[in-house]
């Protein structure tokens, strides 16, 4: 959607996620708690704020494994084997869904076997995932590089779709590729030296990821045949190249051995990511249960310390994700928006906790937080807005479903698990989500129907009542109002100090949350 200007999309995404990563780095090193992305809003905004952050984190975690499985099957379909797992429109066939279920079951089984199996499997996959992209960059830059592709006038120039194309590319795959820095936060409570390790892991992972993907994009654009982009950038690789673009380019360049490695990588890399997130989603289910948000059965572990019920539950939900969102492209937009909403909870949490817990040692402090924290919140809302009304609508269906389950459970939960919700501290959350949805509905994204992969064939277009560029100003002003609102209604100091101890020890949160009410911080 951006042409050669996609390089700017990668730089912009790296900068935005980089600042968000720095926000998480301070929070993670200051509050090294397992499942940190769900815990920070709990500390800053009470039980309802904690559920909101935890639910968004769970949505993105439980959908990533299915996305990675479908990506692997889609790549496999583009090989000479043609196993019949994917329809021509990108959706899975019946046999494809069956194979996807087996893959998800394997991820679940490895996680059930415990941390040692998971760590060994993930270490191997991680080495592979770094080596193959690096090799691809080097080979393509040496073997085939057409510098004219970066300014091909016949294809519309450097930015054939203008600024709108650059922005729209972020939620279509760019941000999705760079996500994942929060994994160091999720396991922060298990690090040997969290105050020293967490912020370094977050920052280094973002720098390496951004550099690799930016160079991959340079190699990709440079390897394209100038004749194929003469008609435009809509389909720069004719035929089935869109299913395995780098492998197709390697084949065309005469390096078939690299294409073979890339097809193997198309299975190993998604499998490694899916394996990690199968465990992450179960960890978050466990955390939501331990926090009193979900039934206690999901918060139980077996003799190996594995949350067996949560793993099975997440496998079932992962399979359901294939049904309404069968297309890889359709799922990427959804999970990107969910992930960025999860990230967006961090800047207000940082502001709230700096005000209500100012004396706590902070091994890493975000520089110029007065500027970077609100800026990161604005930029996170930009990415969600660029995902488009179609994506936001379906994401909000998931969010509403989660709140319905939460409130129903709270209504029937035994007295010992009922939570004081701290409505005042979380008062900014409903206006934030509703307002962002309204702006998206009236805004500029999307302006054309996606080709496939949306639930039940429904594609919802934005009304475009707010002009382009004006819409970004509206999002920015709205975001700043919400940010400073959130900072003013933080939970009081006494609550935060006790909550850190209770969360760290996984004690009875219901007892804690009944004791405090939100109070504005002077």
Language-model features, listed with the residues they occupy:
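Membrane-helix boundary/coupling elements in multi-pass transport proteins
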Residues: 33, 56-71, 178, 183-191, ...
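Terminal cytosolic tails of multi-pass membrane transporters
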Residues: 350-372, 393-522
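TM-loop-TM module centered on a large, flexible mid-protein loop between adjacent transmembrane helices
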Residues: 39-41, 46, 77-87, 201-275, ...
């Amino acid at each position: 959607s951006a042409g050669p200007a996609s390089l700017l999309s990668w730089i912009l995404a790296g900068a935005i996620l980089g600042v968000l990563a720095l926000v998480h780095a301070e929070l993670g090193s200051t509050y090294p708690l397992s499942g940190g992305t769900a815990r920070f809003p709990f500390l800053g905004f009470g039980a309802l704020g904690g559920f909101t952050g935890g639910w968004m984190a769970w949505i993105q975690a439980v959908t990533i494994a299915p996305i990675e499985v479908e990506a692997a099957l889609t790549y496999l379909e583009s090989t000479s084997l043609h196993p019949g797992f994917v329809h021509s429109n990108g959706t899975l066939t019946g046999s494809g869904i069956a194979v996807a279920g087996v893959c998800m079951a394997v991820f679940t089984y490895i996680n059930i076997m415990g941390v040692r199996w998971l760590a060994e499997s993930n270490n191997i996959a991680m080495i592979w995932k770094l080596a193959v992209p690096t090799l691809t960059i080097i080979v393509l830059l040496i073997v085939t590089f057409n510098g004219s592709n970066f300014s091909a006038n016949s294809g519309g120039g450097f930015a054939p779709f203008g600024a709108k194309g650059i922005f729209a590319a972020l939620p279509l795959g760019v941000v999705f590729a760079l996500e994942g820095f929060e994994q160091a936060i999720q396991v922060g409570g298990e690090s040997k030296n969290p105050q020293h390790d967490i912020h370094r892991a977050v920052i280094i992972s973002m720098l390496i990821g951004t550099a690799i993907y930016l160079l991959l994009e340079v190699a990709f654009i440079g390897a394209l045949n100038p004749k194929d982009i003469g008609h435009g950038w809509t389909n720069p690789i004719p035929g089935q190249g869109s299913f395995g673009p780098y492998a197709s380019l390697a084949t065309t360049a005469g390096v078939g051995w690299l294409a073979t490695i890339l097809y193997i990588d198309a299975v190993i890399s998604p499998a490694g990511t899916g394996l990690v997130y199968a465990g992450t989603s179960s960890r978050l289910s466990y955390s939501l249960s331990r926090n009193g948000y979900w039934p206690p059965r999901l918060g139980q572990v077996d003799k190996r310390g594995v949350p067996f019920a949560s793993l099975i539950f997440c496998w079932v939900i992962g399979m359901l994700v294939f049904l309404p969102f069968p297309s890889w492209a359709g799922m990427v937009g959804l999970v990107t928006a969910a992930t960025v909403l999860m990230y967006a909870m961090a800047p207000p949490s940082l502001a709230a906790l700096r005000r209500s817990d100012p004396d706590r040692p902070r091994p890493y402090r975000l520089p110029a937080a007065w500027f970077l924290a609100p800026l990161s919140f604005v930029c996170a809302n930009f990415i969600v807005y660029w995902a488009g009304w179609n994506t936001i609508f379906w994401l909000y269906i998931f969010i509403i479903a989660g709140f319905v389950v939460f409130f129903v459970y709270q209504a029937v939960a035994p007295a010992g698990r009922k939570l004081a919700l701290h409505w005042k501290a979380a008062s900014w959350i409903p206006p934030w989500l509703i307002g962002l949805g309204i702006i998206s509905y009236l805004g500029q994204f999307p302006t054309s129907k996606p080709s496939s992969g949306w639930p039940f064939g429904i594609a919802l277009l934005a009304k475009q009542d707010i002009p382009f560029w004006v819409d970004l100003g509206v999002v920015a002003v709205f975001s700043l109002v919400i940010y400073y609102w959130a900072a003013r209604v933080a939970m009081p100091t006494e609550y935060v100090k006790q909550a850190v101890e209770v969360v760290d020890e996984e004690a009875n949160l219901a007892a804690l949350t009944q004791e405090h009410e939100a109070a504005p911080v002077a």
